[in-house]
């Protein structure tokens, strides 16, 4: 299979995150290899933080797909109402969605940010593969702005003051390298 055909296939989430994509290492594998190598290849458990981050990515990159998220009006995930409505599934809370929608509006209303994200020659969720140290790796750029020769990686954080620690914890440096 040619590199172009592989990249075309990896554009589909079911292939990128599914069996086809598992033949490549990714940045998330680095954390697993560093912290628990025996868990390599295992599906990671969903978390509220990743769910919120995923919703934010979708709101910016593919707003037409926001309906796939289940949203529950509840103060926390520990309430009886949430547990009944979620059916054991991890769902977004309405106040989380409200905050993300406000963040999205602010980003897109900013002339610089909105222009870089919605520019003329821009690609979204662009996958790539590379051989590094004899291993095949995959990565996906959230936004590639060709006019500005810029790659944008959207990130969310609960606390801006702890972002530096989060960047270290989640290996954002290696993600940029890949």
Where do the PLM segments sit?
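Metal-dependent nuclease catalytic cores that hydrolyze phosphodiester bonds in DNA/RNA
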Residues: 1-138
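Mg2+/Mn2+-dependent nuclease catalytic core
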Residues: 122, 126-178
């Amino acid at each position: 299979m040619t590199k172009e055909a592989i990249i075309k296939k990896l554009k589909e989430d079911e292939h990128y995150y599914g069996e086809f994509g598992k033949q490549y290492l990714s940045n998330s594998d680095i954390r697993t290899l560093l912290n628990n190598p025996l868990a390599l290849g295992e599906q990671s458990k969903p978390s509220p933080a990743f769910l919120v981050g995923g919703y934010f990515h979708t709101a910016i990159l593919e707003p037409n797909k926001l309906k796939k998220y289940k949203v529950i009006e509840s103060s926390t995930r520990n309430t009886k109402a949430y547990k009944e409505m979620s059916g054991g599934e991890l769902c977004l809370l309405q106040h989380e969605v409200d905050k993300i929608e406000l963040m999205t509006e602010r980003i897109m209303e900013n002339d610089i940010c909105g222009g870089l994200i919605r520019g003329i020659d821009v690609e979204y969720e662009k996958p790539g593969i590379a051989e590094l140290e004899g291993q095949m790796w995959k990565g996906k750029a959230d936004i590639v702005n060709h006019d500005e020769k810029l790659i944008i990686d959207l990130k969310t954080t609960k606390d801006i003051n702890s972002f530096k620690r989060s960047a270290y914890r989640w290996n954002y440096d290696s993600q940029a390298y890949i």
